[in-house]
Amino acid sequence: MANSSSFSPSTTVTDLISTVHDDIIESHILTRLDGATLASVSCASSHLHHLASNEILWSKICRSTWPSCSGGSRSFFSDAYSMVETAGTVSDLDRPFPELISAVDLHYRGKLIFSRVVKTETTTAWFKSSPLRIDLVDTKDTVATPIKRRQRTEDTCRDLEKDLTLSWIVIDPIGKRAANISSHRPVSVQRNWISGEVEAQFATVVGAVECVITVVTCGEEEMHVREVSLKVEKMEGTHLNGRDSLVILRSVMEGKRVNGSRREVESKKRHEEFMEKKREMKEKKMRVESVFDILTVAFGILGFVLLVVFCLWRTSI
């Protein structure tokens, strides 16, 4: 009777990989993978996990994915690549948070056209009480781009919606956490009919608020970036101040994460749901105000009628 033996597929794969020299795997295989694939490979075996944990690999991936970040690591990639599913609870509100770092990269058709790192002081009274607005482009400056403006505004908007991508990573240097609050591609692109500029909005919804990034482009032939800004907006339409915005951003950094591969689809879906709720809330508010106005007019007329009746009664005595 012939001897038979069974092999576990995972064991067979591991044995085959172990026959390949580590230098070949590190230099010719792992260096060709993107961050998401490298993370998946590291889960295949303990040997690959050890090789894929090389800090140099993750630093190169972070620099190529986010040029605004001069260095990086595996944990940073995990924070910045993943998408927030639900916001976390900020338990230590009294922990020092002296500055918020924003690392921003704007691409058009895969080509980097804007990259900047900005530090925002968070301890001043002005920051805490004023509506949060982080501007990356000076009001007097513009950034030249290779984007050509089409003859029809609709075509220009369609091009930007398809080819413009943005990463806005907020970093807590004390807590050593980060999160990408951009939707990667615009959730909306439209022309400002007053100024004629084209505005692209990227957004991440966090509960009843939305982190809105606005990119404003101008120019008749070759377009320039005139504004790249961040605000945190409530469903009622008002903007949160710096103190409350900081709590929201920290809850995003500490929230539950999911794979960021569906960031564009999920972000746009959440944005549309947010805007629908916003419209419903606005309509409800208008209905309440309309009823209040009707009651005010009715009571006014009733008061006037009673006053006339009272005056007539007095004159008849």
Swiss-Prot record:
Organism field: Arabidopsis thaliana (Mouse-ear cress)
Domain F-box positions: 25-74
Protein name: Probable F-box protein At2g36090
Pfam families xrefs: F-box-like
InterPro entries recorded: AT3G44326-like, F-box-like_dom_sf, F-box_dom
